[in-house]
Amino acid sequence: MVLRVKKQTKVENPRGYIAKVVDELRNLLTAGARARRDPSRENFYEVENAKNVFYIHISPVTGNVVLLAKWPGQSQGAREKAKNATA
């Protein structure tokens, strides 16, 4: 699925990530980001780009995005190796 938000959407940062990380997420979501819905939590998603995975919540009331966690993503090469190892 692809998630896209308006440029003026507020990105909340309760964990205090540096501004560069918040800007990276905002730019990713504004452009349209590949995302996976958390099957056990409504309105929670993993959003990723080439470098990072972001765990976010999108408020159904305000539309605000809450950045809850960030971790390094897998490179395309690592994904291919994992895919081939399980095939």
Regions found by a protein language model. Give the residues of each.
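A short, surface-exposed loop/turn module that caps and links secondary-structure elements
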Residues: 23-49
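Amphipathic alpha-helical recognition patches that constitute DNA-binding helices
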Residues: 13-16, 45, 66
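Solvent-exposed, well-ordered amphipathic alpha-helical segments
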Residues: 20, 24, 32-35, 57-59, ...
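Arg/Lys-rich, positively charged N-terminal/basic patches that mediate binding to nucleic acids
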Residues: 1-20
